[in-house]
Amino acid sequence: MDLRKFDIIKSNANTIFMQVYQPSQMQLDKLNGLMRTRNMYASTATPVGTRATVTIEPALYKEVASHWPSGVAVITAADNDGKLNGLTMSAVIALSLSPMQFLISVDKRSLTLPIIKDGGRFCINFLSSSQADIAMQFASKSTDKLASVKHRISQWGLPIIDGVVASITCDVHSIMPGGDHELIVGDVLDIEHFGGEALVHFKRAFHTIP
């Protein structure tokens, strides 16, 4: 169809519609207002696929994150020379059932991270409700955190802390960057369930489940 003819037909159709419908001035004003609002949002919205630049204070991020209850674990590891270390962590995720995998998030500054990478294995110790002191011990910068903590070395060569609810031993499957942390996916080698009540972290304090 000739585009000029199409424009004439379209214009005539709009004219006929306005003559038949005859909207009030109030309705026209409302429609114009809606169109202006739509155009305003269309011009300011962030296009899909682009990253919005919003400044969020780290303190707010931490405060909001602290309102998410989580279990508390100590991740233990051993390097190829037998050096042991560990760290306290709440960022533990049961990632997959088939195959069985867990994910942990380790700060890039952690002294335990290079040990995990070197040994290629780690153990997740789920702390019990009576082990808040152990959580604090492994959250410290001490280089010999296991010295004052009762534990045994498993058949996989990793420390399992006495009195924990459960332990999960994993082989490192993959490591990927996650901001100022590294995300480590582990294939489950062994699980030991000892029972008991788990330690919970909520609002920057340790709690027990009643």
Which residue ranges define each predicted feature?
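Basic, polyanion-binding surface patches
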Residues: D2-P210
